[in-house]
Swiss-Prot record:
A single cellular component GO annotation: perinuclear region of cytoplasm
Protein name: Palmitoyltransferase ZDHHC20-B
Function statement: Palmitoyltransferase that could catalyze the addition of palmitate onto various protein substrates. Catalyzes palmitoylation of Cys residues on protein substrates and has a preference for acyl-CoA with C16 fatty acid chains but may also utilize acyl-CoA with C14 and C18 fatty acid chains.
Transmembrane segments: 15-35, 42-62, 158-178, 196-219
Length: 323
């Protein structure tokens, strides 16, 4: 038991290495830019991007991943019955009985209720178990080693802003240092130890800029589609089958799902995402017969989008029958 505990502690310690590396690079970039270059015109923009970058990075790292609430845990009697039962079919019947009162619309690939034996909870839609954090995370996107944290419902907006401001930070440094970088190679830069900071500052900023740009673009595309990284690779399965666009509500509504309704808060690393992370509006055209209609929309109201599409589909079928 003791060696396992020591190993686990070592793994947790090593997991902070990428975060410490980024922190050291940022601290050095601050010294190289502010102390060695120290141009007043640049410092205002630099500090603005620096503060927003550090703020969003901090929020991404230290915002605790959201977990399923107690209502998704099996009641004591059903839990005992589930653990005693050996047959998967009977276990599924127990889960289905409990799930009827929950806002669940996604299933496993085999059409079963998604249950985490590790956390002993019925998984809400878009929830997945993270082996690194050893917990189920609401609307899990991925586990990021660069923040040593799971990126999910509670901090996905912060992660997007972290990518945004880190890209702005690197672009600004690379652009403003470029002239000194050129002077370095043309031997026009005065001889001092600062010239080496200029050289490496440009290389590091350009390198991070290129790597962040692709990740930033990809996650903007995911936000526009209202998908997580996991859902992009494996489409969520509904009762009618897999649907990669199952949670897509249209571009503007998809953006609001992550950033909220009030645009004045979009660029600030404060939580404004819609919903509670336990249930999500969908673009389903048919209502799940096994779920109560009041669960279709977080807050107890049926999604207007679902009603319109459902009624339209019903009227179209009736018209076709009359003809």
């Amino acid at each position: 038991m003791a060696p396992t505990h020591v190993l686990r502690c070592c793994q947790r310690g090593l997991a902070w290495i990428p975060v410490i590396f980024i922190a050291l690079v940022v601290c050095w970039s601050y010294y190289a830019y502010v102390v060695e270059l120290c141009l007043l015109v640049y410092l205002v923009v630099f500090h603005l991007s620096f503060v927003m970058f550090v703020w969003s990075y901090w929020k991404t790292i230290f915002t605790k991943p959201a977990n399923p609430s107690k209502e998704f845990c099996l009641p004591k009697s059903e839990k005992e019955q589930y653990e005693k039962e050996q047959r998967p079919e009977t276990q599924q019947e127990i889960l289905k009985k409990v799930a009827t009162s929950l806002p669940l619309y996604t299933r496993t690939g085999a059409g079963a209720i998604r249950y985490c034996d590790r956390c002993q909870v019925i998984k809400p839609d878009r929830c997945h178990h993270c082996s690194a954090c050893d917990m189920c995370v609401l609307k899990m996107d991925h586990h990021c080693p660069w923040v040593n944290n799971c990126v999910g419902f509670s901090n996905y907006k912060f992660f997007i802003l972290f990518l945004t401001y880190s890209l702005v930070y690197c672009l600004f440094i690379a652009a403003s240092v470029l002239q000194y970088f050129i002077k370095f190679w043309t031997s026009d830069l005065p001889e001092s130890h600062a010239k080496f900071h200029v050289l490496f500052l440009f290389f590091v900023a350009a390198m991070f800029c290129i790597s962040i740009l692709s990740l930033f673009t990809y996650h903007l595309w995911l936000v526009g589609k209202n998908r997580s990284t996991i859902e992009a690779f494996r489409a969520p399965v509904f009762r009618n089958g897999p649907d990669k666009n199952g949670f897509s509500l249209g571009f503007s509504k998809n953006i609001a799902q992550v950033f909220g309704d009030e645009k004045k808060y979009w660029l600030l690393p404060v939580f404004t995402s819609q919903g509670d992370g336990l249930s999500f509006p969908t673009r389903l055209v048919t209502i799940d017969p096994e779920q109560p209609t009041e669960c279709l929309q977080p807050g107890g109201a049926i999604s207007s989008l679902i009603i319109v599409e459902y009624c339209f589909c019903k009227q179209a079928k009736k018209k076709k029958t009359d003809e």
